Amino acid sequence: MLIHDMKNGDRFEGYYILQNIAQRTTAAGKPFLTLNLGDRSGTVTAQVWDYTGPIGPGDVGKVAWISGLASEYRGAPQATVYRIRLAEENDDFRVSDLVATAPIEMDKTWDWLVDTVASLEDGDYRAVCQEMLGTYGKQLRLIPAAKSVHHGFVGGLLMHTAYMMRAADFYAGLYPAVDRSLLLAGTLLHDFCKCEEFVTSPLGLVAEYSLKGQLLGHLVLGAEAVSRMADKLHIPEEKSVLLQHMILSHHGEPEFGAAVRPMCIESELLSYLDLIDSRMEIYTENMEETPVGTFSGKIFALDKRIYNHA
């Protein structure tokens, strides 16, 4: 049974992804496990009462066979797990039932991205981008763009990057003052080092943040990677610094995670393109869960509800 289809009182069994596992103790001193179960339709919080193992926090991102009961707590769906074991090699389940995938044609999107990079007029920016694609391309094609807020599915980063580059190419043609090569290069590279920020599960989902991801973040990691690549290719220092600035400033303001504020026309534009694409995906994902003619629940990332009109 898909999580999205579970209703209060339903008994269920099947294969689910284990997320956010924590071992806890009741007030009476009895051990239990709290975790999130996930599949391609959503997630639900669950408890395994009187449980001492073997499953624990080290199994985040793995698949388990589970039987249990769907219920509610204070109006929110949850589940009680009666039986749980890690999936085995010969178990019959489809990864496509468990993992949400970007609604794009992966190969065609990747080919478009490569062709667009080849079209950059500036040879220095083009060289950096092509080398970075060679280094990080495999991860770019697979990983999500975020753990949960937006594009949190396999191929999400590729989709996010490609959509932003299409918009960037349009705006570069609209405003003559914008350096197309710099804008598209910065757009391509802005989230590249999320592959170092995240620890991904064997299924390609974000299990947690890496040590470097927590202490440095993908902006700093990305700027460092570009700096190293620019040095390797003997790119002029100012161009290297401009690319690093694009990455470090793409969150717009320090309160939103930017290391510095945008200080050139291309970095200003990039920060808005990133905001627009992430917001549009947040709206899209939540509208799919909100019946026509009704309001959603409060969306943490937007700090408001949204209305899904006919």
Which residues make up each language-model segment?
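Divalent metal-coordination and catalytic microenvironments
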Residues: Y16, G61, M164, I247, ...
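OB-fold single-stranded nucleic acid-binding module
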Residues: I21-P31, V44-Q47, Y51-S96
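Short, acidic/hydrophobic/Gly-rich beta-strand patch recurrent on exposed beta strands
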Residues: T34-D39, T200
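Extended, charge-rich, solvent-exposed interface segments
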Residues: Q78-P144, L221
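Divalent metal-dependent catalytic cores for phosphoryl transfer on phosphate-bearing substrates
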Residues: S148-H151, M159, F170-T290
